[in-house]
């Protein structure tokens, strides 16, 4: 009886191991397939969109900070959104970060969950897409406007944001400008902080009630940075936050303030 029980137990253990292996293999295969689909969708979206970078006429630019004059010859994005809106009516803008692979249209849903598991074409995909916080209006900026995406290991989506914590990236001031375009305007944001942190909700606070609290909020975000960008902030500034997962346990965060609008 003991021998029979031993054999039965071994068979059960073997079956359990086989089931676990099969499920793990299927899960891994699905993730690989999602990655391939994401690369294909990204290629199609970027390839079918007319995205230009144009140095604007200075008289057309509303300068919000004197720091802009250090970047006065920096180009601004000019994007044809017609085709993007036809592909996905949730499209709200385009974001580009120099020195990274971040150069994508971003979307917005009614929550911050949908585009974590859906691609630009709204197909189910665990790699997700780049999306604006549902609380934000990109054409009527909150104190803090937040854009999210997964940090993929192949540097797709926001995976390459990890570059911003490396000396090679932050010592090159040409990388410090984030470009945003919408159907109605194009904007330049100047980076003032980059860091990794344990998951929290503080840095994605969208609006702050008083000037004093807002200035304190900005100061805390600035002090977290791995590098001192030498950027001054006032309580009147509007900031942009790019947020992504980092090594499965942390968040990769990049903050910048609005310095020019066209």
Where on the chain are the PLM-derived regions?
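Solvent-exposed, non-transmembrane regions of membrane-associated and secreted proteins
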Residues: 24-262
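N-terminal Sec-pathway targeting helices
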Residues: 2-19
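Accessible peptide chain termini
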Residues: 1-2, 95
């Amino acid at each position: 009886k003991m021998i029979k029980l031993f054999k039965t137990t071994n068979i059960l253990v073997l079956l359990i191991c086989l089931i676990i292996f099969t499920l793990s293999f299927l899960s891994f295969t699905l993730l690989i397939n999602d990655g391939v689909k994401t690369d294909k969708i990204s290629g199609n979206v970027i390839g079918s969109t007319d995205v230009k970078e144009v140095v604007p006429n200075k008289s057309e630019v509303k300068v919000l900070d004197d720091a802009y004059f250090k970047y006065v010859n920096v180009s601004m994005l000019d994007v044809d959104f017609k085709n993007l809106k036809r592909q996905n009516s949730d499209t709200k803008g385009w974001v580009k970060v120099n020195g990274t692979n971040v150069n994508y249209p971003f979307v917005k849903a009614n929550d911050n969950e949908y585009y974590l598991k859906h691609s630009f074409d709204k197909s189910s995909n665990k790699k997700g897409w780049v999306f604006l916080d549902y609380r934000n209006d990109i054409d009527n900026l909150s104190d803090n406007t937040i854009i999210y995406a997964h940090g993929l290991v192949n540097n797709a989506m926001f995976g390459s944001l990890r570059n911003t914590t490396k000396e090679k990236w932050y010592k090159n001031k040409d990388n410090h400008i984030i470009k945003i375009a919408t159907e109605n305007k194009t904007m330049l944001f100047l980076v003032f902080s980059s860091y990794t942190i344990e998951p929290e909700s503080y840095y994605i606070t969208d609006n702050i009630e008083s000037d004093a609290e807002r200035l304190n909020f900005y100061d805390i975000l600035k002090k977290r940075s791995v590098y001192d960008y030498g950027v001054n902030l006032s309580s009147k500034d509007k900031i942009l936050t790019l947020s992504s997962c980092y090594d499965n346990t942390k968040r990769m965060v990049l903050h910048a303030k609005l310095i020019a609008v066209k």
